[in-house]
Regions:
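Extended active-site neighborhood of metal-dependent phosphoesterases/phosphodiesterases
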Residues: 2-15, 85-159
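N-terminal active-site segment of His-dependent metallophosphoesterases
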Residues: 2-84, 89
Length: 159
């Protein structure tokens, strides 16, 4: 879990991330990478990771938001159903940028027959050094229902 200046977790579903006053705050949103990290997806994975690297380096974001389908544990396309390995490889890749990131799951991150369900995948992602993620409250359906409040230095919510 990310732990840096201007960041704190209030409870199981609420985070605060302070926005610096002296400059624009950049949020990069990426979706549908469909990384397979398997025998059949090597070329496509390299192209996707190269594109992600290029856009991160060009934009220098303060926060990256992944909106589903980061990984794709589908045997005919990736050559593997091991989404645990896929998630761990993705985390190693994205953590090297040293930029906080968050995510929501898509319909392909936990394909039927994949090694891990959303609960287990959530545990894996919370181990990311720069990941801001929570499973959320148990009384709300789904995994990954949480808030990131972007605030000023007085914790007034800006966005």
């Amino acid at each position: 879990m990310f732990c840096g200046d201007g960041f704190r977790q209030k409870d199981e579903e609420t985070f605060f991330l302070e926005i610096p006053e002296n400059r624009d705050y950049k949020i990069l949103q990426l979706t549908d990478l469909h990384l397979g990290f398997g025998l059949f997806s090597h070329k496509k994975d390299k192209m996707a990771l190269d594109a992600v690297t290029k856009i991160i380096n060009r934009t220098s974001p303060d926060l990256i938001v992944f909106t589903g389908d980061i990984i794709f544990p589908f045997l005919p396309k990736a050559g593997t159903m091991n989404n645990k390995k896929q998630a761990e490889r993705f985390i190693r890749f994205i953590d090297r940028f040293k930029i906080p990131y968050t995510l929501v799951f898509g319909n392909h991150d936990c394909e039927m027959g994949a090694k891990c369900g959303r609960e287990q995948l959530a545990d894996i992602f919370t181990n990311g050094k720069y990941c801001i993620f929570s499973k959320g409250r148990k009384d709300i359906f789904g995994v990954g229902n949480f808030f990131i409040n972007l605030t000023d230095n007085q914790e007034n919510v800006l966005m």
